[in-house]
Amino acid sequence: GGRIKRVSPQRPKVAKSTRVLDLKGKVLMPGLCDGHVHVTALTPDFSALARYSPFYTAARSADVLDGMLMRGFTTVRDAGGADYGLAKAVDEGYMRGPRILFCGKALSQTGGHGDVRAAGENFTFEGCFCCPGLGRIADGVDEMRRAARDEIRKGATQIKLMVSGGVSSPTDRVDSTQFSMDEIIAAVEEAEAANIHVMAHAYTARAVNRAIVGGVRSIEHGNLIDETSVELFVKHGTFYVPTLSTYNAIKAEGLKAGFPPELLSKLDDVLVAGGRALAMAYDGGVKMVYGTDLLGDMHRHQLKEFGLRAKVVSAAELIRSATCNAAELFGMQGEIGTVSVG
């Protein structure tokens, strides 16, 4: 069960008892894929999220997952927060939702995009593995290897690195680079040894280019890339996962949803630039994957990414980004992404 046995323009002969759906005039598509989600991000305030009860977070994630499935998404790649427990609950039918590909905790340097401590907070933060936060700290090559191996031990289907500053982190600049090249390469080596890939949060051309050269498989966001980045994307076969919908959602309703007001000024650095980066990548032939990165109550805008990208990208390329391109990035060709036999 669950497999396509035949694709044909002719209606097959079947027993009278067989259920037949006449979908003439309709379009049959593969299940959609979202290459950048945070199914446990119940609030856009990551400092608050890290203090939530893990049981409360898991319970509320059920609604997030159900909503994704009802929008047509049957596979999602979680970019920090979800672990094997949620993925297993969905696989075993205890929660209704899409298949979850998870990284566990995203890896961040001290003071990086995954470090949720404010400047005046001096407690030790190791990403407390029982808490619902999205990240964990790793400084230096040895810690990077240990952290990557630990997430792999817990079943991660990809490793997530924070290689630049971000909008939602309290103490870094969007234009900062994070992790040394040796640290990036160490994580990539550990992922490759386990036959999985690395996804990297990065905004500026400098951060993006370092990550691509270091061997990551996909760049997340990339709003501030330049032509040198496009050349590297194509040369290395790296995938690009823009996330335009989250910036528009935060701009429109972020404060109401709980986004920290002191961080809202960072949004201007990337909001308008996202469309330019998308056009640059599309014109340059970069292979792109659909992603949204929505948080809290803003998850309901998941389908709006299509409309935002449609201003730049062809309809055919949009569909590929959410189907066959995603399947290739995930290493799941033949399993998802196409309507084909098998």
Where are these regions (language model features)?
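Acidic, metal/ion-coordinating pockets
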Residues: 56-59, 63, 99-100, 122, ...
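Divalent metal-coordination and catalytic microenvironments
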Residues: 2, 25, 33-36, 72, ...
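Active-site environment of divalent metal-dependent phosphoester hydrolases
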Residues: 40-42, 75-86, 165-169, 202-209, ...
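Active-site gating loops and adjacent loop-to-helix segments of metal-dependent hydrolytic enzymes
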Residues: 40-59, 66-69, 104, 110-133, ...
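His/Asp/Glu-enriched, well-ordered alpha-helical/loop segment
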Residues: 52, 193, 197, 257-262, ...
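Histidine/acidic residue-rich metal-binding segments in metalloenzymes
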Residues: 142-240, 256-258, 267-288, 334-337
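Histidine-rich, glycine-flanked metal-binding segment
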Residues: 1-29
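Metal-associated gating/positioning segment near the N- to mid-region
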Residues: 23-92, 109-118, 182, 206, ...
